[in-house]
């Protein structure tokens, strides 16, 4: 999957194989999914794998492989695209592992070149509860985030949602600190 040419064959196989064959492929790469995702060629093959997930077993392999590596993947040039593909293709409940990790490492993610963009995509794809989970963390650290070259974009993004409750919460955090 990481070969400059072989990754294209892997992508084609995923498109045309049966669910049972796809189960075998996904299960066989499960332990290596993170390292494959971090590779410039492998990331495309993993994204294609996510595009063609067709059974619950396959989805669970993906979730299990990435669950402890979300921040590492988000902060990587190649890996962040895999997390974004999960956000786009998996349902909100299956993506909860991403939301939990991003919320737990909000400042680290929001102040990173790739992380700030992925965090915005998290907000886009979130359920109502997940959005509240993220915005609560962003709000708590908003004073720190607005002083960062990348974090400030995340706070602006929340304000651009034009949700009065979000705006009020962020405004409250800034009270007494506007002059600093």
Residue ranges and their predicted role:
Residues 1-180:
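Eukaryotic gene-expression regulator signature that favors modular helical reader/repeat domains
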């Amino acid at each position: 999957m990481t070969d400059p040419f072989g990754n294209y064959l892997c992508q084609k196989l995923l498109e045309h194989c049966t669910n049972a064959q796809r189960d075998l492929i996904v299960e066989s790469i499960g332990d290596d999914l993170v390292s494959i995702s971090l590779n410039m060629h492998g990331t495309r093959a993993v994204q294609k794998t996510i595009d063609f997930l067709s059974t619950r077993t396959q989805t669970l392999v993906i979730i299990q492989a990435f669950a402890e590596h979300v921040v590492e993947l988000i902060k990587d040039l190649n890996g962040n695209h895999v997390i974004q593909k999960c956000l786009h293709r998996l349902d909100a409940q299956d993506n909860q592992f991403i939301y939990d990790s991003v919320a737990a490492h909000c400042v680290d993610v929001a102040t990173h070149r790739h992380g700030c963009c992925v965090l915005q995509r998290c907000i886009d794809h979130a359920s109502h509860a997940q959005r509240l989970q993220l915005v609560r963390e962003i709000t708590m650290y908003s004073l720190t985030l607005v002083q960062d070259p990348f974090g400030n974009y995340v706070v602006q993004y929340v304000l651009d949602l034009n949700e009065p409750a979000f705006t009020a919460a962020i405004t409250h955090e800034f009270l007494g600190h506007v002059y600093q």
